[in-house]
Amino acid sequence: MKKTTSLLIAALAVAPLAHAAEGGFVGGLMYAATDPVTFVAFLCMVTFLLIAARMGAFKTILGGLDTRASNIRKELEEAASLREQAAEALALAERRAQDADKEAEAIIDQAKRDAKAMLEEARRDLAEKISRREAQAAARITRAETEATSEVRRAAADAATAAARRILSEQTSVDQFEAAARDIERALS
């Protein structure tokens, strides 16, 4: 009933304006409510509205508006739900990004530790190789010294033997010379 009353009031306000637009109130001497044309138009409109109200036209219109309002309300609720889901998805994505950053940092740290370990191992291997090569070089030097000493001794022995043969051959007989040469060779060898 309240809605019907508000519609009637709206009709009363609009009717004089419509009549004035058509050229009513000639000279402005007459008030709109006392004009018979306006009054008849107003009665026709009120009658039409009452018949429409009895037939349920306003219920249909209001039902459609209520349906539209409920649909809009559902869409708003759905939009709010979608917004919450989007916020949750964003939070999840941010957490995953943070986890990925932490994992990347952990991988980088592990790679640095592995690189340090590999560097230390390479240094140890290099030091071991250098030590082995130094030992091999020292062994070669010792062998070379031993061989050189042996060659010098042989050369000295050969020279001493040759000198002794010369001296003995000049001073002794052949048998004594041969025996002395054998003794010298045995002693030097």
Swiss-Prot record:
Q: Does the keyword tRNA-binding apply?
A: no
InterPro entries registered for this protein in UniProt: ATP_synth_b/b'su_bac/chlpt, ATP_synthase_B_chain
Keyword field:
ATP synthesis, Cell inner membrane, Cell membrane, CF(0), Hydrogen ion transport, Ion transport, Membrane, Transmembrane, Transmembrane helix, Transport
Which residue ranges does UniProt annotate as crossing the membrane? 7-27
Instruction: Give the protein family.
Output: Belongs to the ATPase B chain family.
PANTHER family given for it?
ATP SYNTHASE SUBUNIT B, ATP SYNTHASE SUBUNIT B', CHLOROPLASTIC
The name this protein carries in UniProt is ATP synthase subunit b
- Look up and give the organism this protein is from: Hyphomonas neptunium (strain ATCC 15444)
Output the lineage of the source organism: Bacteria, Pseudomonadati, Pseudomonadota, Alphaproteobacteria, Hyphomonadales
Q: Which gene encodes it?
A: atpF
